[in-house]
Every structure is written in C-alpha cells, then in structure tokens.
C-alpha cells in the first residue's frame, strides 16, 4: 500500500498519467499470501498455492500426430435478437449434456430452439419457451419479425480432464459481496492436497485487500479489471474459474474475454443470465452512517437468508469464514456499483465453455428458477441441486461441493461417433 502511495506521488511530480497500469508488483507475506498491486495504490491479497514444481516431462505429441479426437466438441449455435425484445437461440449441433454426472438434476438433451423474452431493466423476468419460434398462442400465426442482429457461433473446442498432477491447470476462486477468500478454505485445502494449483483473491475492500474510500473503486468494471489483472498474472494453458454469487459475474466476464484460456467454469448460486443494474429502492441506498447502525441487523438477516440453519455451527462459519464482513461504505458502494448492461442473455448465450451450475435449494437470495434459466441459456451447462445447502453452500456442505467440483474437473465429453476409432481388422486365419 505504501509503495502504491509513493508511486502515485512520483506520478504527479513527473507528469505521468495517474491511472496508467504498469507491471504488477507483489509482496510475499510470511503466512503464504501474496499482495499484488494491480494499480497504483490498489492492492489485492491473493492466496496462491500449489504443489512443489516437478521435473518438466517431455512435451506430448500434438493432437494431429496422435490422431486423438477425445474431448473434441463442435459448438454450433445461431442467436437472433428481434426488435420486439425477444431472443431466439437455435442449437445447431450436438451438445454433450447427459454424460456428466450420475444423478444429475435436470439432465437431458437441450431443445433445438429456445425463445426467450429479454429481461427489461425494470426487473420483469423473461419467460423461456422451448420449441419453434413460429408457434403462437391460441393457434394464431405470428407476423414475420425482422431481426435486429444475428450471431453465428461455429467453432471446435477440446474439453479435457483437468487433473491435479497437470502443470498447465490453474483453479481461480472468486468470492461475492461481503465475503473474502476465506469462504473457499475447504475447497482450497482440498484441491491443493490433490495437487492442483489454486488462486483466490480478495476483492477490493474485502478481506485484507486495500479499501479505497471512493465509490467508483467498487463498480463492476473496476472490479472486473482487477480480476483481469490477477487472471493474466497467474493464468496458464487450461484455467478453471469458480465463482460464488456476485463473483460469478466476473467469471462470466473472463470467460467471454478469454475463450481460449478459460477451459471450464463453475457457478455457485450465481443467479440468472440477466444484465446487472442496481436497485433504486434498496436498503443499501441509505447513507453509510445509517447502514453502519443497521450492521447487526444486516448480519442477522444474512445468516437467516444465507444458511439453511441458524445454529451455533452456522454462526461460527459466518464469523470464521468472513462470509459477511465488510465496512458499510464498501457494502453500499458494491451494491450501487453493480451496473453491467452488457451481461445480458445474449452475452451468456455466446459462451462456448462448459459450465457447472451448483445451487443450494434453501437459498433465499437466488431462486432456483434463476439458475434453471441460466442452464437453458448456456450452450454447455449442467445444473446440480444440493437439497441441504443454501447460499453459502461451500461452507455448509464442503464435502458435497468438493466432490461435485472435482467430478466436473475430471469430466470430458465422450467422443462423437465420427471421432471413434475404427476397429482393427481381424487377423487372417492360418491355413492348415
């Protein structure tokens, strides 16, 4: 932090632009954390852990040399946006849906076409209607509509199993509003033991990261640029993004910005595929001093809404996990800064990365219908419901969450019939 302030003073004296982003500077602490300066005066605490570096193995043969077609998926989709505010998503290829998890909730082949009414900024929820776009209510034929724009997606992706011993795999964990990287403790310990490299930052104003006293420091775009800087610093060839609540939006942003580097995404209680817009009538619009006085009530409300039970164990988890521990100023700025009009249904429908959706059925912040709608919009999505979990499901049910995440990391789609190797010819019979 002191280094950032000093650099800012020198920038002013030398006439350099104060917001110019230079090379990331970092300081290692004795307790295993790294403090990364993403911008002058803006320092994030990062937990970066992994196995000891192993001897470099010989480089593997290329896929063309091996003739390997495993994990190869053809992503074909047409997205049409109409002027009347409706969205038509047509899946033109075969998506690997039902071969992920045994006992998966809501598994099955995606509909050939999905018609969605885009959610308006006022907050009315869109309704998705699987089926043909030409069908109308009451047998009445609709008038031909002029499309506003059409997006064609046609690409091939290789989706492979991500194992802990592989040096090109990195897991990124991003928390939500009011939390810190401590909410991922069980997941970080679990995956480090399995040999994975993990990266978990504290958002600005959260945990041990710096907390600028300017509301503009907590807009979605400011926080997204922080996550971009962390991602570019630690990313390798195959990166997996795991987000919770508001953190899911940053995972979506990075997956959209870096489709070749993001291998898989896991969204935990992230909500529906709608653009972000702060609510005008919210308790978080009250003055900071009022929010400070209400902080005990807000913490109790979070305990009731974020946990399936409100016993001594949950209270301890809330305290130790820093699930809701943030200043009133940062909380108000975070809630009012959730403005991201680009992150609408079209933005999510363009993603071609496989996504695992995890939802705690007792969640009072995010209705299950929102995650179900997200699963409908995404091209490669798998929804898993945890009956005994709530919004903080990674704290309540760590073993279940760890198992689901690990299974998804190891999953790879079955090869298409065209990619299956031809059987070897039978050896000729010997003549007697």
Curated annotation (Swiss-Prot):
Q: Where is the AB hydrolase-1 domain?
A: 170-272
State one molecular function term (GO): lysophosphatidic acid acyltransferase activity
Q: Does the keyword Hydrolase apply?
A: yes
Q: Which residues form the active site?
A: 245 (charge relay system), 363 (charge relay system), 391 (charge relay system)
Family annotation (InterPro entries): AB_hydrolase_1, AB_hydrolase_fold, Epox_hydrolase-like
Q: Which GO terms describe its cellular component?
A: cytoplasm; mitochondrion
Give the record's keywords alphabetically: Cytoplasm, Hydrolase, Inflammatory response
Could you tell me which Pfam families the record lists for this protein? Abhydrolase_1 (PF00561)
Can you supply a Gene Ontology BP term from the record?
phosphatidic acid biosynthetic process
Q: What top-level branch of life does the organism fall under?
A: Eukaryota
The record's region (Disordered) falls at 47-69, 121-149
Q: Where can this protein be found?
A: Cytoplasm
Q: What is its EC number?
A: 3.-.-.-
Biased composition, Pro residues: where in the chain?
A: 52-61
> Which residues fall in a compositionally biased region of kind Basic residues?
139-149
Q: What is its main location?
A: cytoplasm
Does the record bear Hydrolase in its keywords? yes
Function as written in the Swiss-Prot or TrEMBL entry: Negatively regulates NLRP3-driven inflammation. Promotes NLRP3 degradation through the chaperone-mediated autophagy (CMA) pathway, hence attenuating inflammasome activation and IL1B secretion. Acts by recruiting palmitoyltransferase ZDHHC12 to NLRP3, facilitating NLRP3 palmitoylation and subsequent degradation.
Assembly information from the UniProt record: Interacts with NLRP3 (via NACHT and LLR domains); this interaction is enhanced in the presence of NLRP3 inflammasome inducers, such as ATP, nigericin, silica, or alum. Interacts with ZDHHC12.
Similarity-based family: Belongs to the AB hydrolase superfamily.
Q: What is this protein called in UniProt?
A: Protein ABHD8
GN (gene name) = ABHD8
